[in-house]
Amino acid sequence: MAISHIRLTTAPVLVVPSVSMEDMDRYPDPERNLAELIMAVQSVALACQNLLLAAHDAGLGACWLCAPLFVPDLVRDVLVLPSAWQPQAMITLGYPAESKEKARAPLESRVLWR
């Protein structure tokens, strides 16, 4: 917990991607409403991936944290977010203090080809 606190309070930028269903269409079918929520969450996740890729390309370090999924009310309260917003993640951004080179595992060790 202390490490997360340090990451959150020392990062130059903190992005809190959120979902709001407030402006979305509502349907009488609960399954359709659930599908709409899932699509909204997926859209936010894809936007986050693009943000992470753009940050890397710009030489920024980024860290995806999923803590808001466990304490959404706390995140909304601390950041004074609208009650309809559902925080999905936190992304810290900044220039890395040090550069670490990681060896990549072969693609075949991570992908199953059929």
Identify the function of each model-found stretch.
Residues 55:
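Hydrophobic pocket-lining residues that define ligand/cofactor binding sites across diverse proteins
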Residues 39, 58-73:
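GST superfamily/GST-like fold recognition
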Residues 50-51:
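Aromatic/hydrophobic pocket-lining residues that form π-stacking "cages" and hydrophobic walls in ligand
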Residues 1-43:
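Glycine/small-residue-rich phosphate/adenosyl-binding loop
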